[in-house]
Amino acid sequence: MTKKGRIMGSDVEPGALYRNEYLIEYSDVDFTKELKLSTLFMHFQDTAGQAAERLGGGVDILTQRYSVAWVLLKIRVEIDRSPLINEAVTIETWPHPQGRLEFNRDYRVRDAKGNIIIRGTSVWALIDTKTRELRRSSLIDLNYPPFIEEHALDYKFVKLKP
């Protein structure tokens, strides 16, 4: 499967883990030949979107059924090593149990040898597409498989207040 020449393939694990393989290209790096944060976040978003689609929470379903959309509220990333041009990487993502307003999702980036080179965690919420107000997470029904208890980062964001 190819998307803009970047996605090399997807791997759906039994359970909540979802993977995408990417090849880092010239447009993905900065003048130091290291991955741009904007590209990393784009790949995180694409991989999370595909994983959400698999769980019944894709963009089309949310918009048509519930008149809501995903919005990224917070993200934290720790980079041990930045991938270089022509390097193949695998992005893994998995959700955690939802809160009242928020959905937490973790990420790992592995190099071709399987070493974890980047870790991330994020907080997402639902926003009403008409009123632009936050909506409770219980509004939608996601088909969650068993959760992975492992966290990519030992970091807790401050909870949202309704």
Each PLM stretch: what is its role?
Residues F31, K36, M42, I79, ...:
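A broad, structure-centric signal for solvent-exposed, well-ordered loop/edge residues
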Residues R108-R110, I116, V123-T131:
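Hydrophobic, ordered structural segments
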Residues Y18-N20, I75, I91, R105, ...:
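Hydrophobic residues positioned within well-ordered beta-strands of beta-sheet architectures
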Residues G15, V68-W70, N86, R100, ...:
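Short coil/turn motifs at beta-sheet boundaries
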Residues T2-L72, T121, D128-P162:
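Hot-dog-fold acyl-thioester-processing enzymes
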Residues I75-K113:
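Hydrophobic beta-sheet segments that form the core/acyl-binding groove
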